């Protein structure tokens, strides 16, 4: 039986905890399938069965590491680890037995140890510290574009040309605000979580009309287990709409499952992917999310966006014109968002969680796009997706500085570090969908 979790950190209980030793077999059995959830951080074993529901980063992201070593994701996601460890004391139930390795045999020890040395080097170099002027100017350029969009209609009227220009400017505002909220959501701007969360609410809530809690819930899972089926929500379109990855597509075919004609998915992707995700799904689901979970602060920030848009554009366009502008902007933004966010992951390895080490988890699911001033701006520096996934709290203006160090690490251990031109990255989304669709069809018909 599992030992009862210790609730109050006093000296006597601390001594008892030091005497409790566990094996990896015992830890692996507490993966959540039987309700109990344990995880390991720096050889210490924590019972997160009840705490997972109260976890500030979301219940699912921490549960995805139940039964596993979570040392590297713990370090990667938290900016004030000392404070977090104090709250973790009440969850501590023991540690790994002395004869047990520090992590599971599925993980590369030499690679993990060297990556941790790289992490320490990166911190000593100051690459985890943000240049606040960079983010201030980035915010100002978004606000200026927002004002320019309104001035275009106010000065030049609402005929086709100024209306179209306004829509393009507003789409740019929404896309760039999406990249900026991503920075604050990852706690990569300020040294305290409080300030990051506050500005995150402003950017994603007031500038975009979306809830911060929804983004945290979805995006942190993606970073914890990228391209892992049933753990990464970014691939939840498998198998309902798409057959993704070689492994999962063949599995689906062998099981004789056909929710869609997957062998044509590289064609209908252009209809239900880039143009539809935001206006036909996210736009409505986010309201369901905040109401269902009673996220009233998020709802207030979201409503402030709609109130602002209504009172600034309604006098110029009327209700029909405003609705037309709004959905054109969401349509354009959706295309921008989907192509950029999918180019780094969909063409890469997609599978079930194999519980490999942190570096392998991120590199097998992630690729980069070549650096240029335009690519950096257009993608919000997500063209450095590998560096971002390895160091999610690193300010984006430092990605190019750490990239050579990451490349050296990958070369030493024979890990493919893939970077490609922007248009090639876009095309690879379609090619990978075509390939996995064909693999599904072959397995469906012949296996």
Swiss-Prot record:
What is the membrane topology listed in the Swiss-Prot or TrEMBL record? Multi-pass membrane protein
- Name the source's superkingdom: Eukaryota
The EC number(s) this enzyme carries: 1.14.19.44
Instruction: Using the record's annotation, list all stretches that form the Cytochrome b5 heme-binding domain.
Output: 19-97
GO CC terms, sorted: endoplasmic reticulum membrane; mitochondrion
Tell me which tissues or organs this protein is expressed in: Highly abundant in adrenal gland and mammary tissue and moderately in liver, kidney, lung, spleen, thymus, brain, and eye.
Pathway noted in the entry: Lipid metabolism; polyunsaturated fatty acid biosynthesis
Asked if the Swiss-Prot or TrEMBL record annotates the protein with the keyword Membrane, the reply is yes
Which of the residues are on side Lumenal?
A: 154-161, 290-308
Q: Which residues lie on this side of the membrane: Cytoplasmic?
A: 1-132, 181-268, 330-447
One GO BP annotation of this record: response to fenofibrate
- The residue range of the signal peptide is none
Name any one Pfam family assigned in the record. Answer: Cyt-b5
Q: Which GO terms describe its molecular function?
A: acyl-CoA (8-3)-desaturase activity; acyl-CoA 6-desaturase activity; oxidoreductase activity; oxidoreductase activity, acting on paired donors, with oxidation of a pair of donors resulting in the reduction of molecular oxygen to two molecules of water
Positions modified as N-acetylmethionine?
Answer: 1
Where does motif Histidine box-2 map? Answer: 219-223
Q: Where are the membrane-spanning stretches?
A: 133-153, 162-180, 269-289, 309-329
Q: Can you say where in the cell this protein is located? A: Endoplasmic reticulum membrane; Mitochondrion
The residue stretches assigned to a coiled coil in this entry are none
Q: Where is this motif: Histidine box-3?
A: 385-389
Keyword entries, A-Z: Acetylation, Electron transport, Endoplasmic reticulum, Fatty acid biosynthesis, Fatty acid metabolism, Lipid biosynthesis, Lipid metabolism, Membrane, Mitochondrion, Oxidoreductase, Transmembrane, Transmembrane helix, Transport
**Chief location of this protein within or outside the cell:** endoplasmic reticulum
Q: Which reaction does it catalyse?
A: (8Z,11Z,14Z)-eicosatrienoyl-CoA + 2 Fe(II)-[cytochrome b5] + O2 + 2 H(+) = (5Z,8Z,11Z,14Z)-eicosatetraenoyl-CoA + 2 Fe(III)-[cytochrome b5] + 2 H2O; (8Z,11Z,14Z,17Z)-eicosatetraenoyl-CoA + 2 Fe(II)-[cytochrome b5] + O2 + 2 H(+) = (5Z,8Z,11Z,14Z,17Z)-eicosapentaenoyl-CoA + 2 Fe(III)-[cytochrome b5] + 2 H2O; (11E)-octadecenoyl-CoA + 2 Fe(II)-[cytochrome b5] + O2 + 2 H(+) = (5Z,11E)-octadecadienoyl-CoA + 2 Fe(III)-[cytochrome b5] + 2 H2O
Q: Outline what the protein does.
A: Acts as a front-end fatty acyl-coenzyme A (CoA) desaturase that introduces a cis double bond at carbon 5 located between a preexisting double bond and the carboxyl end of the fatty acyl chain. Involved in biosynthesis of highly unsaturated fatty acids (HUFA) from the essential polyunsaturated fatty acids (PUFA) linoleic acid (LA) (18:2n-6) and alpha-linolenic acid (ALA) (18:3n-3) precursors. Specifically, desaturates dihomo-gamma-linoleoate (DGLA) (20:3n-6) and eicosatetraenoate (ETA) (20:4n-3) to generate arachidonate (AA) (20:4n-6) and eicosapentaenoate (EPA) (20:5n-3), respectively.
Domain comment from the record reads as follows:
The histidine box domains may contain the active site and/or be involved in metal ion binding.
Full protein name: Acyl-CoA (8-3)-desaturase
Look up and give the organism this protein is from.
Rattus norvegicus (Rat)
List the gene name: Fads1
């Amino acid at each position: 039986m599992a030992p009862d979790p210790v609730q109050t950190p006093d000296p006597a209980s601390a001594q008892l905890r030091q005497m409790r030793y566990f094996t990896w077999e015992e830890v692996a059995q507490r993966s959540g399938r039987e309700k109990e959830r344990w995880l390991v951080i720096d050889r210490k074993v924590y019972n997160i069965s009840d705490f997972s529901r109260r976890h500030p980063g979301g219940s699912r992201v921490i549960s995805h590491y139940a039964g596993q070593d979570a040392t590297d994701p713990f370090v990667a996601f938290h900016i004030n680890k000392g404070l977090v460890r104090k709250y973790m004391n009440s969850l501590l139930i023991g540690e790994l037995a002395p004869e047990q390795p520090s992590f599971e045999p599925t993980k590369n020890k030499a690679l993990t140890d060297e990556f941790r040395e790289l992490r320490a080097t990166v911190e000593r170099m100051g690459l985890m510290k943000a240049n606040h002027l960079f983010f201030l100017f980035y915010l100002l350029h978004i606000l200026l574009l927002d004002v320019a969009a309104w001035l275009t209609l106010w000065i030049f009227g609402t005929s086709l040309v100024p209306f179209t220009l306004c829509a393009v400017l507003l789409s740019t505002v929404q896309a760039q605000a999406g990249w900026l909220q991503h920075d604050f959501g990852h706690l990569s701007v300020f040294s305290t979580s409080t300030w990051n969360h506050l500005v995150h609410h402003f950017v994603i809530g007031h500038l975009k009309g979306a809830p911060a809690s929804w983004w945290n819930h979805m995006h942190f899972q993606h970073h914890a287990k990228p391209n892992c089926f049933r753990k990464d929500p970014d691939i939840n379109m498998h198998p309902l709409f798409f057959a993704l990855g070689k492994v999962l597509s063949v599995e689906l075919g062998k099981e004789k499952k056909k929710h869609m004609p997957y062998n044509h998915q590289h064609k209908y992707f252009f209809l239900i992917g880039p143009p539809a995700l935001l206006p036909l799904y996210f736009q409505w689901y986010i309201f369901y999310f905040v109401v269902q979970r009673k996220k009233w602060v998020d709802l207030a920030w979201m409503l402030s966006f709609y109130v602002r848009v209504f009172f600034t554009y309604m006098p110029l366009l009327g209700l029909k014109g405003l609705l037309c502008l709004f959905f054109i902007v969401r349509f354009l933004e959706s295309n921008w968002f989907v192509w950029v966010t999918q180019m780094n992951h969909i063409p890469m390895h997609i599978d079930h969680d194999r519980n490999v080490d942190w570096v392998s988890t991120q590199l097998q699911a992630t690729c980069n796009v070549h650096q240029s001033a335009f690519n950096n701006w257009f993608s919000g520096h997500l063209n450095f997706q590998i560096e971002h996934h390895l160091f999610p709290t690193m300010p984006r203006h430092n990605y190019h500085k750490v990239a050579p160090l990451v490349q050296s690490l990958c070369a030493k251990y024979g890990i493919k570090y893939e970077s490609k031109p922007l248009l090639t990255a876009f095309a690879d989304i379609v090619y990978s969908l075509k390939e996995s669709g064909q693999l599904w069809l072959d397995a469906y018909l012949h296996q």
